[in-house]
Amino acid sequence: GSRWFAAHPAPVPLAGIRANLNLDTVGRLGSGPVRIIATGTASEWPHVFRGVGFTTGIAIQNIEGAGQSSDQQAFIERGIPGVQLFAGASLDYHKPTDTPDKIDAAGMVKVATVAKEAIEYLAARPEPLNATISAAAAAPAQPPPGTPRERRASLGIVPDFAYTARGVRADSIVPGSPAAHAALQAGDVLLTVAGQPVDDMQAYSNVLK
């Protein structure tokens, strides 16, 4: 959907879109910070969200990379600075067990407050953000040739999306999963899976397809 919109922008042309704020996985904040993913796409982003945190008193964690984690990537690929507001994944991530009764409403108010403050700043700013999008960040994610689009396997780790070093760090482990049977623990970092290198989340996703 986001890539289609970016390819067929209406009623506003791409030249009129200064930034993208994407709210994705914001229902389980708990006591954690509001994570801002892909702040490396504009030089102002880290300062904007530090200011929002100071003004609102809401804990915020700026994460420079991981732009390909969600729909902001469709805009980043076209040179538009984009970020994702993220509350953190849970063991119910992408499962039918992610039911409405588990939503942290107070946490969502915090996320909405952060979004509101950032949007008001952008609306009042007379000039565009200074995009700092690298060629690697702007490149569309491409699975290896012959890789089916559907995910065929699950290891059973909930990734730590705030982790930006090499590999994929487990935030938590799904009980009874292959990862649990292999004695993986929260905090462990995957560097290879089935003999294939796993340098980042995109590589990990491709291995499981």
Where are these regions (language model features)?
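Generic beta-structure capping elements
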Residues: 24, 88, 96, 160-162, ...
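Solvent-exposed, polar/charged alpha-helical surfaces in well-ordered, non-transmembrane soluble domains
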Residues: 3, 47-51, 73, 106-120, ...
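Metal-dependent peptidase/peptidase-like ectodomains
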Residues: 2-90, 104, 108
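C-terminal recognition in membrane/secretory proteostasis and scaffolding
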Residues: 129-209
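Short, structured secondary-structure boundary patches
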Residues: 81-85, 97-109, 193, 200-203, ...
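Sec/Tat-exported extracytoplasmic proteins
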Residues: 9, 25, 52-57, 86, ...
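Extended hydrophobic-aromatic, low-complexity segments
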Residues: 2, 32, 61, 84, ...
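His/Asp/Glu-rich mid-to-C-terminal helical/loop segments that flank catalytic regions of hydrolases
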Residues: 91-138
